[in-house]
Amino acid sequence: MRLAIMLSATAVAINFATCSAIDQTKVLVYGTPAHYIHDSAGRRLLRKNEENEETSEERAPNFNLANLNEEMFNVAALTKRADAKKLAKQLMGNDKLADAAYIWWQHNRVTLDQIDTFLKLASRKTQGAKYNQIYNSYMMHLGLTGY
């Protein structure tokens, strides 16, 4: 009898301590005064962008989705290793191009097996392991992962 009372009292105390700790963290997170946030802290490491577009550094080439050739992403039609490798390298180097490819593949119902065959053709030595990022990103695009 005494053990049951001690266990229930312990459970109540733990519940009370947990609930009060959660309320305090909400106050700390939502109640941060604005004067503690420094405006320059978030921008300290960023470089100033130059206004002249010709001299500013380009991180990625200009990309226009309207100019894409539909046959470019057709992995089923790729039979030459050089073409497959070229497309895989382009997809690895340009996120916008990769996103466009994922959308095109999803629209044309390209299966993961076809993507795997394409990647194995692109890198025969590693059996496609070199381009796992493309395969995994396409899986995430399709929503087949736990994220």
From Swiss-Prot:
Superkingdom: Eukaryota
Induction (record text): Expression is induced during host plant infection.
Consequence recorded when altering K85E: Reduces the PIP-binding ability
Family: Belongs to the RxLR effector family.
Pfam families reported for this sequence: RXLR
Gene: Avr3a
Protein name per UniProt: RxLR effector protein Avr3a
Functional description taken from the UniProt entry: Multifunctional effector that can suppress host BAK1/SERK3-mediated immunity through at least two different pathways. Manipulates plant immunity by targeting and stabilizing host E3 ligase CMPG1. Preventing the normal 26S proteasome-dependent degradation of potato CMPG1, and thus potentially of its protein substrates in the host cell, further abolishes host cell death during the biotrophic phase of infection. Also associates with the dynamin-related protein 2 (DRP2), a plant GTPase involved in immune receptor-mediated endocytosis.
Renumbered ranges of motif RxLR-dEER: 44-59
Region (Effector domain): 77-147
